[in-house]
C-alpha cells in the first residue's frame, strides 16, 4: 500500500476507535521494518500522528461517559456519578 500525501491528509474523524488503531498499528509495523523511503516515512508518520490524536479524542470522550455506581450505607446501589467525581 503506497501512502500518498492525499492519504496522509485524509480525514480520520469518522473512523471508529478500532479502525484507527488498526491503521496505526499497520503504520508502526511499516516504520519499524525500515523498508520505506524517507519521504514516505514522513508522510505515514504524519498520518499516524493524526490517527493517534483521533484515538486520544475518542478515549477522552469515552472516559467522560464512564460512571461509577454510588452505594448507600447498606452497600446497595444508590445511583451513579461521574468516575472522576465531577
From Swiss-Prot:
A Gene Ontology term for the protein's cellular component: exodeoxyribonuclease VII complex
EC annotation from Swiss-Prot or TrEMBL: 3.1.11.6
GO molecular function: exodeoxyribonuclease VII activity
UniProt keyword Cytoplasm, yes or no: yes
BP term (GO), one: DNA catabolic process
The keyword Nuclease appears for this protein: yes
Keywords: Cytoplasm, Exonuclease, Hydrolase, Nuclease
Catalyzed chemical reaction(s): Exonucleolytic cleavage in either 5'- to 3'- or 3'- to 5'-direction to yield nucleoside 5'-phosphates
Subcellular location: Cytoplasm
Matching InterPro entries: Exonuc_VII_S, Exonuc_VII_ssu_sf
Stored SUPFAM superfamilies: XseB-like
Superkingdom field: Bacteria
Enzyme superclass (EC): hydrolase
Family per record: Belongs to the XseB family.
Subunit relationships: Heterooligomer composed of large and small subunits.
HAMAP family (UniProt xref): Exonuc_7_S (MF_00337)
Entry protein name: Exodeoxyribonuclease 7 small subunit
Species for this entry: Agrobacterium fabrum (strain C58 / ATCC 33970) (Agrobacterium tumefaciens (strain C58))
